[in-house]
C-alpha cells in the first residue's frame, strides 16, 4: 500500500504551464534553470542523468574592413556561406541564449552585428551544434565542429573562430518529467521502508518545473526540486 500511495501522488501531478512550454524546445545547458528563472537553488539527491542531445560551440565572425558597408557585406556573406556548408559538415546552426532557434538563410537577418573590441570592426556570434550519443563522443563532436569552422573560407577580411568554451543542449527537458518522477518514487519507497512502520514520507514540490545542470563532459542532470519529509504516522 505504501508504494501504491506514493505512485498515485506522483501520477496526479499535472505538468505546469511553464513546463509545457519546454516539452519540445531545445535549451542550452550552461548551468541550471535556476540562473535563468530564479527558482530555488536546492538540488535534490535524486534526478535523471542522461546524455545531452548536442555539443554546442559559440562561434564568431569578425570583420575589420575600414569601409562600413563593405565590412558588413563581408561578414554577412561569410555567415551565409557558413549556413550553406553546415549540412554537408553534419552540424546544425542556431542562435539564442536560452531557448535555441535554428539559424537558416530564411532568418539570417535576425542575427545582429555588434561592435567588436577595435575601431572599424564588427562581429556576429552564433552557435554550431554537433549531435551526441551513439558512437559520437564529446571529443568527436568537438573535432567535427573544428573541421566545420576550418571549412568555411574567409570573405575579404572577415574570419570565423570559436567563441568561448563549448556547452551542451537538451531537447524537451520537461518531457522527462515521468522518468524523473519514477526515480523519486523509487527513492521515496526505499526511504519509507528504512524508517519503519512508525514513520511515513511526504513529497513536496512535485509541481515545480523540471530543472537541469551539467553533470559531465557529455551528460546532463534533469531534476525536480522536490523535498522529502519524514513524518510520524498518526
Describe the residue ranges of each PLM region:
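Sec-dependent signal peptide recognition
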Residues: 2-7
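Short, charged, surface-exposed interaction patches
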Residues: 20-187, 193-234
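N-terminal signal peptide c-region/cleavage motif recognized by signal peptidases
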Residues: 14-16
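Short, linear, compositionally biased motifs with a strong N-terminal bias
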Residues: 10-11
